[in-house]
């Protein structure tokens, strides 16, 4: 079942036969933040590519996603291509590092939707809704994410290497207190 898929379910092996975790560490240090030029970077890349494939396939079973408008679905599919990209606080580069509000702004701008630069200001964008729909913004204190459907979000999470951080899908939008839910769509 793809929905119960966890990064720990995958073991990669380096060229010398040493088992490495998907984040490129040997499992001894869960805070490994090695650069993308190290010998294990291709394993992280392979893992994020696999994660994108698994997540995209899982969307077919996501009831809310399937029932959403075409534009809302396109927002999610567009955002998901960046799974595994790096998080940088204050960053605005989708390739070199981006923070949560710059990520939501980047994704929505692709669809002609304007958002302010910081998460606090994004809490006032669009219209307030009580229940999230695919493509809506989930606003927290100091953080913002895009709702996928069936309780899941995509967001630029934190500075840790993917899959622990970076741009990723999280399984519950209620993982912390929600301040507001904002819709930028007219449907």
Range-by-range predicted roles:
Residues 92, 158, 186:
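Residues that form or immediately flank small-molecule/cofactor binding pockets and catalytic motifs
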Residues 65-72, 96-101, 131:
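Solvent-exposed, acidic/flexible segments
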Residues 23, 96-97, 124, 151:
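Residues at secondary-structure transition points
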